[in-house]
Amino acid sequence: MGKTLKSRLVAYQANGSKLGLLPEPTSYTVSFTHDAVGALTVSYSRKALRGEILDRRLETGLEIAVEVSDGGRWIEPYNGRFVIASRSRNALDVSDTVSLTGVSYGWLLKKALNLDTSRLETKGDEKGTRKFANANAGTIMRTFMDENWNRGGVKVDCSRFTSGADSAGKQWGYMLPSIYYDLGISIQDVLDSLVNNGLCDWRTD
């Protein structure tokens, strides 16, 4: 007899502690996307069990994880954590149901930017851009993420890979002879370009 995969919603503070289960959603849809940003939509009555969790102001941060189980323990799968980006409700709805829209955690890299002006090219056709020479995908991403972290930017932990090896411990392959990035480009756009050129894959966990 085959197993049935079940799912549930768990709320968290932004990059923080667990707020609790959300056991009575009206409905929800989710996409777990490899090498891209997935999405979550949830309808939930704030009069339902633990609905008060959704009274939080979005400015204080709210994340929802989608956990799954096939009858054993509950786990949060890869790409299963979502940052709630918007909330809406019908003021005339007596059930006080809110509609939440979330994007997977990798979306936060949109907020991390190439801002180091001290490393820009100062002459030639590429003046004003950031150059990487003889660099692999790990070196490029590690450099940008470390700079973002050290200046107090978006707190996304990418410590499992280095400039020498990916998160599985395998050495990076192709070395880019040279590549240039505009000032202000998001690290998400940098990552997308590396993925699209077959230089790396990514997921969140």
Positions of PLM-derived features:
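Charged- and aromatic-enriched interaction segments used to assemble
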Residues: 97, 103-205
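Juxtamembrane "anchor/assembly" segments of surface/extracellular structural proteins
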Residues: 1-60, 100-109, 115, 119-134
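Short beta-strand and beta-hairpin "edge-sheet" elements
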Residues: 70-102, 203-205
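Short, solvent-exposed secondary-structure boundary motifs
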Residues: 14-23, 71-76, 190-195
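Short conserved beta-strand and strand-loop elements enriched in small hydrophobics
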Residues: 60-73
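Surface-exposed or flexible loop/turn and strand-edge residues in extracellular/cell-surface modules
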Residues: 37-39, 79, 176
